[in-house]
């Protein structure tokens, strides 16, 4: 990428696909100058999940403040920027619209190029702040709405070689946490409890031995809920640490074994972890351990915790790659909640 750069490229990234309103200024696609995230977790906690209408209202309230703060922290004005990148999809349509409209307005007013970004491409490119990419590479993307194995042979070329057939891993975490009476977001709570528990319940590992790289978590979720229900029917209250550890062991086993198998089959130079569930300590530790054992020649890249959840620095990073490839979005760009990674 270095050869393409005549000068420093400064991109403003905007992210509003779910329950974080974020803006960031990034230099050359790999250096964060500022990153501001306004989280809505407290507002959604009492509902046990994200309420789209509440999310949209928060985005409306926060978007201008967040963008202004990102510019202020970076000590730049709109005139210093080379372009504006924004999450175009997938996500909640009402939430996406707020970011897209803000980006279109700013780009139009300041005569700047506009670049639409796929949210998952953003999660993958969050790893660009750690190191340059070496192709071919494989990304394990694990979040509330996505569980995918994505093969890349070049920048901005995505091939999904495995995906969930039902629930995403993060979704299963949240549902299981709710049945245990844990606060939202559930994944973090399960991870904490699992540290002090043992895999005593031996929940099923779905599609573990199949040739495909697809995932399935609905059977595990049902097994967990049924086990908990049956124990409570008998008047027993199971150890929540062991329940959490058993659930997490099942998820991590499947994710890691399929990822290692795919990395071997496609002979990748780098293996990336991406998405909100990339913050999960159990998953991080197990992946590090297995890569050392099974793929000593493969470089494992794990983003810092601050870049696992939704943020705008990752959108600016992915947007910079598209910008330098000459890709532009028109002012007719709209929020696209069903945007496919392979179509970008």
Swiss-Prot record:
The lineage of its organism: Bacteria, Bacillati, Bacillota, Bacilli, Bacillales. Keywords: Acyltransferase, Cytoplasm, Iron, Metal-binding, Transferase, tRNA processing. It comes from the Bacteria. Required for the formation of a threonylcarbamoyl group on adenosine at position 37 (t(6)A37) in tRNAs that read codons beginning with adenine. Is involved in the transfer of the threonylcarbamoyl moiety of threonylcarbamoyl-AMP (TC-AMP) to the N6 group of A37, together with TsaE and TsaB. TsaD likely plays a direct catalytic role in this reaction. It catalyses: L-threonylcarbamoyladenylate + adenosine(37) in tRNA = N(6)-L-threonylcarbamoyladenosine(37) in tRNA + AMP + H(+). GO terms for biological process: tRNA threonylcarbamoyladenosine modification. It comes from Listeria monocytogenes serovar 1/2a (strain ATCC BAA-679 / EGD-e). Coiled coil: none annotated. GO terms for molecular function: iron ion binding; N(6)-L-threonylcarbamoyladenine synthase activity. Belongs to the KAE1 / TsaD family. It is an enzyme of class 2 (transferase). Gene3D superfamilies: 3.30.420.40. One of its GO terms (cellular component) is cytoplasm. This is tRNA N6-adenosine threonylcarbamoyltransferase. Substrate binds at residues 141-145, 174, 187, 191, 280. Binds 1 Fe(2+) ion per subunit. NCBIfam families: gcp_kae1, T6A_TsaD_YgjD. InterPro entries: ATPase_NBD, Gcp-like_dom, KAE1/TsaD, Peptidase_M22_CS, TsaD. It is found in: Cytoplasm. Its cofactor is Fe(2+). The keyword Chaperone does not apply. Its EC number is 2.3.1.234. Fe cation binds at residues 119, 123, 310.
């Amino acid at each position: 990428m270095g050869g393409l750069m005549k000068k420093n490229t400064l991109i403003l990234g905007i992210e509003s696909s779910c329950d974080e309103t974020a803006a960031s200024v990034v230099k050359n696609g790999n250096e964060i100058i500022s990153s501001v995230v306004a989280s809505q977790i407290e507002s959604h906690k009492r509902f046990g999940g994200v309420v789209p209408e509440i999310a949209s209202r928060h985005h409306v309230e926060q978007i201008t403040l967040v963008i202004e703060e990102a510019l202020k922290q970076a000590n730049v004005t709109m005139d210093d920027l080379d372009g504006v990148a924004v999450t175009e999809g997938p996500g909640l349509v009402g939430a996406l619209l707020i970011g897209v409209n803000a980006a279109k307005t700013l780009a139009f007013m300041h005569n700047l190029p506009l670049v639409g970004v796929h949210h998952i491409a953003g999660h993958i490119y969050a790893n660009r702040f750690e190191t340059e990419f070496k192709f071919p590479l494989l990304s394990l993307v694990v979040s509330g709405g996505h569980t995918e194995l994505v093969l890349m042979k070049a920048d901005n070329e995505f091939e999904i070689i495995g995906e969930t057939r039902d629930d995403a891993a993060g979704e299963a975490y949240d549902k299981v946490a709710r049945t245990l009476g844990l606060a939202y977001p559930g994944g973090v709570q399960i991870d904490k409890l699992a540290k002090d528990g043992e895999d005593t319940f031996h929940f099923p590992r779905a599609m573990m031995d199949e040739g495909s790289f697809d995932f399935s978590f609905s059977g595990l979720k049902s097994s967990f809920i049924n086990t908990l229900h049956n124990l409570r029917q008998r008047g027993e209250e199971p150890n929540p640490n062991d329940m959490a550890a058993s659930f997490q062991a099942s998820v991590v086993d499947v994710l890691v074994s399929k990822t290692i198998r795919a990395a071997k089959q496609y002979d990748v130079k780098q293996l990336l972890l991406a998405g909100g569930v990339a913050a999960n300590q159990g998953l991080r530790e197990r992946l590090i351990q297995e890569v050392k054992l099974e793929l000593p020649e493969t470089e494992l890249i794990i983003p810092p915790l601050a870049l696992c959840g939704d943020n705008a620095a990752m959108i600016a990073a992915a947007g910079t790659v598209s910008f330098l490839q000459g890709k532009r979005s028109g002012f007719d760009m709209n929020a696209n909640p069903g945007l496919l990674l392979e179509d970008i």
